[in-house]
């Protein structure tokens, strides 16, 4: 893959990840059912990808698989809470609330890995908090915007935990295999609760959820992994910071969810903090990139 093709691939992957909220809103099913269906189609897509793509690392051993299954539970929780936010507050607020996860990552790295947090990183956390304050018109638990934002922030917190767990358990492991095991964990964990919803799922929902699993998870993740073989991790991180931009743009076009000036200002602060956070990572870990399975 050439450098130009890798850039196209990573932008296409970010675009697909940005469509997750849009497809989740189009589907009439519950967030639990949507997440189960997404995992089902993602497992099928990742199985195909594992045969077509050259492995980027080793196959996970049983100890690693246990960690990946735990990561799958976090990923499943992240998906469910994200789609709840989409249903309650809309795609824009849900996407921007989730985009707060770098702030949680900064704080949790200091607590869990005892890494020194620099003053500028605390500044980025403050920037995200100000951005979140601007995204919602006012903090009122009777407001759907506020409730949806809280669900989205919880989704971002769970994703931050997932990112840190992946950092510990995916060293040297093929990224597609890691994503496959995590989606398999979601499939198994949600099956007892989502089966009734799947049985009564509207026919059109199969299309939206199938696209979520195949394109916004399986294919998007495969493009991400393939591009990492050519691009620097920092470059891909900055490009993936555009995910909320794509999500808000599609929601505006398809659902007339026109963002307010406050929301645009808050979103700009959150995205800037995300980009700055990725640029501040001084030394990349000497391991394979962790599985990237975003909303």
Feature-to-residue mapping (PLM):
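Membrane-interface interhelical linkers
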Residues: 1-12, 43-70, 113-122, 140-147, ...
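Glycine-/small-residue-enriched transmembrane alpha-helix faces in small-molecule transporters
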Residues: 1-40, 73, 81, 141-168, ...
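Helix-helix packing/entry segments at the starts of transmembrane helices
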Residues: 7, 94-100, 165-185, 217-253
């Amino acid at each position: 893959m050439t450098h130009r093709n890798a850039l196209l691939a990573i932008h296409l992957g970010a675009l697909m990840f940005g469509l997750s909220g849009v497809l989740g809103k189009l589907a009439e099913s519950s967030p639990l059912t949507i997440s189960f269906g997404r995992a089902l189609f993602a497992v099928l897509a990742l199985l195909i990808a594992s045969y077509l793509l050259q492995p980027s690392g080793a196959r996970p051993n049983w100890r690693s698989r246990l960690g990946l299954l735990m990561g799958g539970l976090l990923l499943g929780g992240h998906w469910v809470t994200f789609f709840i936010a989409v249903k309650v507050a809309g795609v824009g607020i849900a996407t921007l609330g989730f985009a707060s996860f770098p702030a949680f990552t900064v704080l949790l790295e200091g607590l869990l890995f005892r890494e020194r947090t620099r003053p500028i990183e605390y500044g980025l956390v403050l920037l995200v908090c100000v951005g979140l304050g601007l995204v919602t018109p006012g903090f009122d638990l009777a407001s759907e915007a506020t409730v949806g934002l809280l669900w989205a922030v919880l989704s971002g917190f769970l994703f931050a935990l997932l990112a840190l767990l992946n950092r510990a358990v995916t060293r040297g492991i093929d990224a597609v295999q890691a994503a496959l095991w995590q989606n398999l964990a979601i499939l198994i964990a949600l099956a007892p609760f989502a089966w009734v919803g799947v049985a009564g799922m509207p026919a059109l929902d199969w299309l939206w959820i199938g696209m979520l699993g195949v394109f916004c998870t399986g294919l998007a993740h495969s493009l991400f992994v393939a591009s990492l073989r050519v691009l620097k991790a920092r470059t891909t991180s900055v490009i993936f910071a555009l995910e909320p931009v794509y999500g808000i743009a599609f929601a505006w076009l398809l659902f007339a969810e026109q963002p307010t000036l406050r929301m645009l200002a808050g979103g700009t602060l959150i995205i800037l903090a995300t980009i700055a956070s990725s640029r501040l990572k001084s030394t990349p870990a000497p391991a394979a990139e962790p599985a990237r399975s975003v909303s």
